[in-house]
Swiss-Prot record:
Organism in which the protein naturally occurs: Conus marmoreus
Signal peptide: 1-24
Protein name: Conotoxin mr3f
Molecular functions per Gene Ontology: ion channel inhibitor activity; toxin activity
Comment block on domains: The cysteine framework is III (CC-C-C-CC). Classified in the M-1 branch, since 1 residue stands between the fourth and the fifth cysteine residues.
Lineage: Eukaryota, Metazoa, Spiralia, Lophotrochozoa, Mollusca
Amino acid sequence: MLKMGVVLFIVLVLFPLATLQLDADKPVERYAENKQLLNPDERRGIILHALGQRVCCPFGGCHELCLCCDG
C-alpha cells in the first residue's frame, strides 16, 4: 500500500510540478530577446533604472532616466 502511495504522489504531484516549471521559462526568454533589440543607450538606461542609479543628463536633455546635474 505504501508503494502505491509513493507512486501516486510522484505521478500526481511531482510530475505536474516539473512540467509547469518548464512552461514558466518561456515568457522570460521571449522578454529577453525583445530587450536585445534596444540600442545600447536605452539598455543602459533600463539597467541603471532597475538598479536605482541615475546618471547626469546631457545638456538640455533631462528626462526620467537621468538627473539634471549642474555643470
